């Protein structure tokens, strides 16, 4: 009798091989797809990192895309000046030059959302004049006492260019623009052989409960903290320190049952603003156990340790970087290092190392 395989056995073997090959293809595809969850409290810099990824890996913004940021930039700029003028009333800080009152009325007459391709000339003139007023400058110095957009000074300093009839937003203008993220946004980038799927979720408190269980299979979590906000209060609850809120959120994510095997990359962000603030706003006023004075390195170490010490899992890796999300050169360097970490983590998760 022949010892050849029966038709049934051949079909069974072929099916097994096809299943094995499909599993292998799935593993390879999984290896080439990186799912990254961007987390952090509101205004920590998550959306800025996504914009940097576009600049670094997709060649930047087209003319049409830059055009689309004009209204956001105009609205951010006008709204920031309005916030300062309202704060001057509540803090009882007068204008140095009362002739500026005309410009104040111009600002208050503007809608919340500025529409159009050009900032009205009278609005540009009003912001330029008010920004030079000592009363406005004094109020700006006290911005930790109210809620002011981080980019206010940048836009005010550049108001002549922004208000020009032929204005076209540059990379920095776009990076510093601010729109509150609500819900979950997914952005995809191709980096080398890898496809990055980056999920950005709303940072404000009301957004958080919606998403946590949806992402237990992510490759890694990129968690951002605005360390410059150590002396500021939450937008949603002006009794809670922003840094304390970030620590609470990091604790809940780092030790969540959904993310036990997930590595975390921690960006301690806005180091430029942090460095400026330390000499004028003592950290000890907000964190009494801090003993480093206005020494930048000591303050960085203190904050780093406060976050890393929350990790309750010995096997969980936390990779840390001090960052300035608006600095494209620095973010390009940091993201290259992050890419190496993520590749290793992904190979581990796929069972390939």
Swiss-Prot record:
Residues 7-26 have a biased composition (Basic and acidic residues). GTP binds at residues 43-48, 150, 175, 181, 203, 269-270, 272, 325. One of its GO terms (cellular component) is heterotrimeric G-protein complex. Residues 173-181 are annotated as: G2 motif. Residues 35-48 are annotated as: G1 motif. SUPFAM superfamilies: P-loop containing nucleoside triphosphate hydrolases, Transducin (alpha subunit), insertion domain. The lineage of its organism: Eukaryota, Fungi, Dikarya, Ascomycota, Pezizomycotina. GO terms for molecular function: G protein-coupled receptor binding; G-protein beta/gamma-subunit complex binding; GTP binding; GTPase activity; metal ion binding. Keywords: GTP-binding, Hydrolase, Lipoprotein, Magnesium, Metal-binding, Myristate, Nucleotide-binding, Palmitate, Transducer. It comes from the Eukaryota. This is Guanine nucleotide-binding protein subunit alpha.
């Amino acid at each position: 009798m022949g010892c050849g395989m029966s038709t049934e056995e051949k079909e069974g073997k072929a099916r097994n091989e096809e299943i094995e090959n499909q599993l292998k293809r799935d593993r390879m595809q999984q290896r080439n797809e990186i799912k990254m969850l961007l987390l952090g409290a509101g205004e920590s810099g998550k959306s800025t990192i996504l914009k940097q990824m576009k600049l670094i890996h997709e060649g930047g913004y087209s003319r049409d895309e830059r055009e689309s940021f004009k209204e956001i930039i105009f609205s951010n700029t006008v709204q920031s000046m309005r916030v300062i003028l309202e704060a001057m009333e509540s803090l009882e800080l007068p204008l140095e030059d009362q002739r500026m009152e005309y410009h104040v009325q111009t600002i208050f007459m503007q809608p919340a959302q500025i529409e159009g391709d050009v900032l009205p000339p009278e609005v540009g003139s009003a912001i330029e004049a008010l920004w030079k007023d000592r009363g406005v400058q004094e109020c700006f110095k006290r911005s930790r006492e109210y809620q002011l957009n981080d980019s206010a000074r940048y836009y005010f300093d550049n108001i002549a260019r922004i208000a020009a009839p032929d204005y076209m937003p540059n990379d920095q203008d776009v990076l510093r623009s601010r729109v509150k993220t609500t819900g979950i946004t997914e952005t995809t980038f191709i980096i080398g052989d890898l496809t990055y799927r980056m999920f950005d979720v709303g940072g404000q408190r009301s957004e958080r409960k919606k998403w946590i269980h949806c992402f237990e299979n992510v490759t890694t979590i990129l968690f951002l903290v605005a360390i410059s906000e150590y002396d500021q209060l939450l937008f949603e609850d002006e009794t809670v320190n922003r840094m304390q809120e970030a620590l609470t959120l990091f604790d809940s994510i780092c030790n969540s049952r959904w993310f036990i095997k997930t590595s975390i990359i921690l960006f301690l962000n806005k180091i430029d603003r942090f460095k400026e603030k330390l000499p004028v706003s003592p950290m000890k006023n907000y964190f009494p156990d801090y003993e480093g004075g206005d020494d930048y390195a000591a303050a960085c170490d203190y904050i780093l340790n406060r976050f890393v010490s929350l990790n309750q899992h010995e096997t969980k890796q936390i990779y840390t970087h001090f960052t300035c999300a608006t600095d494209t050169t620095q973010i390009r360097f940091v993201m290259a290092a992050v890419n190496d970490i993520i590749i290793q983590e992904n190979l581990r998760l796929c069972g390939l190392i």
